[in-house]
Structures are given as structure tokens and as C-alpha cells.
Amino acid sequence: MTALALLADSRFPSGGHAHSGSAEEAVSQGWITGVADLERFLLLRMSTSGAVAAGLAAAAAIWAGATGATGATGATEEHDPIDRMAACRVPGWLDCEADARMAAPASRAASRTQGRLLLHTARRVWPRSRALEVLDRGAFGVPSTPSSPVRPDGGATGAGALGAGGRLSRSAPHHSLVLGAAAAAAGSDGHGAAVAALYGAVGAAATAALRLLGLDPMAVTSCLAALCTEIDAAAAAAVASATMAIERSDGSILPSHGSIELDLASQRHARKEMKLFAS
């Protein structure tokens, strides 16, 4: 748990401080003017993009456990919830499932940017993690799940084209996948990964709103504390869906909640030249 706390700490050098989770655009649009508005916004974040990230992170942590994740003590544990060949395909179809759940191109770009930065740091902190190595090398092939079918030309429908050799031609895996693999490397499980994803989804937005509006830090912290019960419940639901998705190799079981308001906010923010946060 101590290593997981390190991963969830905002001071962990993974670039998360540069992102507001659309809070900056929400402030610009007048959606957030005070603590009461912030609380409603955090609930929206947690129940949509937060829930999606939690499901993906939990699934990635389960996969990482099957791959062989090096814990904080350096010991490698082997698990067998999925067979070896399926384990090789999991990152590919999870990556596609993440793409399919982010309607805004700006959100996908921000997720991959944060994924790359977190992966760079996590590889230094947990160098013996095989799952992190797989993500770092992009060593995963064509996804083959009912919700991520493969076209006759070799591309995954709805998730972008594949590069030569059937490998995903993307610069970095999504943040939630790296978070799940890093959580497993830190000795945690799917629930820990889901909690970290959910807290990250609301924590970044809360911190950004505090800085942008000069809110009372104690009031903002109280908002986050009030969400603890909801975060625990959402994490449990994410683990249940992730476990079933991995067992059945069916990514459609993962949470897929979205918000058109957040998608549009993400796109508007990306087009702005003057801004404090990258997303």
C-alpha cells in the first residue's frame, strides 16, 4: 500500500500537475464558480471519465499480475487468470477499448501524453516489471475481442489503423493502462489501481479549480473527502467489470460512461492558445 500511495501522490514525477481534467475549461465557461459547483463537477468526472479509467486500470492491473509484475520488494509473483497467449493480446485490445471510450481526440491525446510520462517514470522506479516493459516496447499485437473486431485490412474498427506487422502504431499507451501496470508493479491489485484512477480523475480537477479560483483549500479537501465512499463503491464496480472482461476477453463489459459536455470542453480547451493547463 505504501508504494501505491507513492504512485497516487501528486508529487510523483509523471506530469499530472500539468492537466486539469477539463476543470480549466469548466471555470472558463462558468460551470465552476465556487465549492458547490466544484463538488458537482467532481461527481460528473468520477461517474464518467473516472469510472472508465478505473475499469481500464483495474483490467491492466489484472493483466499485469498474469504477466508477472515485480512488486516493491523485488519479488515476482505469477498468477494465471488468463492463458499466456491471451495475456499477450490484452494490452492491445485494452488500448483500443480506451480509444473507443474517449470521443474527443483531445482527450485521447492527453491520455497518451500522460501515459508516456508515467511510463517513463514507472520504468525507472520498477525496472523489473514485465508488464511495464511490454507497454514501453509496444509489444502487443492485433486486438481480438467482440467489441474491438478486426477489419479484413488488418485494422481495428473504430479504434484507428494498425502499423506494420499488426502492431498498434501509436506513440504511447493510454494513461489508465500504464497506471494499472504500475500499480501491479507497486504490489497492488485491481482495486488499488481503480482507486488510484478515480482519485486522480477528481484530484487533478480539484487542485486545478483551487488554483484557478483561489478557493479555500480546506473546503476543496472537504469536497474530496466527501467523495471517498463513492470512490470506494466505484472502484469495487470497476474491479468486478474488469475481472469479467479479462476472463471473457470481452472489453464491452468495461465501464463506458461518457459526458458530451466534458468531451466538448476538452476540444475547446485544446484549441485555445492562452491556457494554464495542457488539458
Q: Where would I find each of the regions flagged by the language model?
A:
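Long low-complexity, repeat-rich segments biased toward Pro/Ser/Thr/Ala that often serve as propeptides
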Residues: 67-70, 157
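Glycine-centered signal
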Residues: 73-74
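Serine residues within intrinsically disordered or low-complexity segments
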Residues: 144-148
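Compositionally biased, low-complexity flexible segments
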Residues: 151-164
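Metal- and O2-centered redox machinery and metal/ROS homeostasis
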Residues: 1-68, 77-143, 162-279
